[in-house]
Each structure stands twice: as structure tokens, then as C-alpha cells.
Amino acid sequence: MKLFVFLALAVAAATAVPAPAQKLTPTPIKDIQGRITNGYPAYEGKVPYIVGLLFSGNGNWWCGGSIIGNTWVLTAAHCTNGASGVTINYGASIRTQPQYTHWVGSGDIIQHHHYNSGNLHNDISLIRTPHVDFWSLVNKVELPSYNDRYQDYAGWWAVASGWGGTYDGSPLPDWLQSVDVQIISQSDCSRTWSLHDNMICINTDGGKSTCGGDSGGPLVTHDGNRLVGVTSFGSAAGCQSGAPAVFSRVTGYLDWIRDNTGISY
């Protein structure tokens, strides 16, 4: 059922003259599978804040998102870009069996006003939803507090989740997958990517990665269970290529989220 947005990379052509390594620049391409690789099946209720998003517009495409309030979902701007509406799937462990769904139109999608589809700066969007009651299978994830807005989270462990394939070329799994990953510093990630300050990266050593994962989906810290990343892009070379996977850094958007939703910690 699910084909998740994945992002390919434009890589500079090699020349015969030795030169410093050139950083990679992301280029979004829709309708390519994202993947959770070398993860594990998430037990029912482990990730009650994740939603599956089926967008409609010029075609249909799938992304992930995170419940941050009774009437709000956070996702990626490259997911909402060009959408005329979205069906939100709540409480699914088996990807084809959500507890319930809601549909909302483009008027309830708030895409970051400075989103740049060329370099994926400000790759973040909000979706205003009908009110949902929280219970064991459908619940919110908390944002970082304002006291942590300058925290870089380097060295912290986090969990990413989604319904993407479990290895390069694999079919989509029926069951929600999670993977435990370590956040790396901006300086380490900048060796591979041309980064914006409001991006955050994970180490993919050992083939553990979202590799783009469910674009728009969550990266949540083990310590404190705070949503610190929104899945943005990964390497087109494959999920086990070793390149860091990149997320929008939620702490960089706390003011924007508060101004649009009233949610803050």
C-alpha cells in the first residue's frame, strides 16, 4: 500500500585531476520507496504518534508524519508541496489497517514559507486535523522545550520509524519498523552534505538507517522521548551506503510551530 517519498542526490562528476571532495546536494524525487534498514518490528503501541499520509495532487504519494497535538501533525514540506489534500492514517501497526482515517484539504496544510525545494532548506510543514482523542495506539509526541533550543543532540540515541522496505530492493513490509540510531554533529555530517543550520543527521554505520525513510516521519530521542527530527533526505546510493541520513531539526522551528499551533514546552 505504501510508497514513501525518497530523495535522490545530485553527485558531481569525477575528473582526472585530484580535487577536494565535493559535498552532495539533495534533489527531491517523489514516488521512490523510503526504507528502514536493519531495524526491527515495532510492537503495537510503541510509536503511537506516527501517522501515514496519503497525499493527492498531481498524482498520489505517501509520507510519514508525527502527531504533536490533538489537531496537529508535523511532516516535511517536500511531502506537502503541490498537495490538494491528504488522508491521514492513525494508529496503524499493519500499514493497511489504520485504526481510523481523516481527510483534510490544502487549506489546512501550512507549509513553511521559506521552504526551498532545490536544497530542502526549511523542509517542514504542519497539517491541521480534526480533533483526535489520545489513547494507547494514538497519541502525541512532545517537542523539545525552549530550554533545549540550542541543544545539538550530537551523540544522543534516537528512534526512527516507518513502513519502508527493510533492505535495498526489498518489498514493503506489512508491519511498522523502527531503528535505533545515533545523532552526529553538524561538523561530521557536513563532510558529506551541504547543510543548513536547521538540519540534523544520524550515523548510518552498520546499515542502520531511514535512508530517507518515511519522508516526513519522526526521529525521537530515547532520553525524554522528544521529537527532534523530521525525515528529509538520504543517499540515492542505497540505504547501506554509509552516508548520513538528514532530518529537519525541530529545535530550529519551535517559534514557527508555536506561532501556528500554540504548542510549546
From Swiss-Prot:
Tissue expression notes: Abundantly expressed in the larval gut.
Catalytic class of the enzyme: hydrolase
Paired cysteines (S-S): 63-79, 189-201, 211-239
Keyword Signal: yes
Any one GO molecular-function label of the UniProt entry: serine-type endopeptidase activity
One Pfam family recorded for the sequence: Trypsin
Top-rank taxon, per record: Eukaryota
EC number(s) on file: 3.4.21.-
GO CC list: extracellular space
Active site: 78 (charge relay system), 123 (charge relay system), 215 (charge relay system)
Peptidase S1 domain ranges (all copies): 36-262
InterPro entries the record matches: Peptidase_S1 (IPR050430), Peptidase_S1_PA (IPR009003), Peptidase_S1_PA_chymotrypsin (IPR043504), Peptidase_S1A (IPR001314), Trypsin_dom (IPR001254), TRYPSIN_HIS (IPR018114), TRYPSIN_SER (IPR033116)
Biological process according to GO: innate immune response; proteolysis
Signal sequence, renumbered to the chain: 1-21
Record family assignment: Belongs to the peptidase S1 family.
UniProt protein name: Serine protease 1
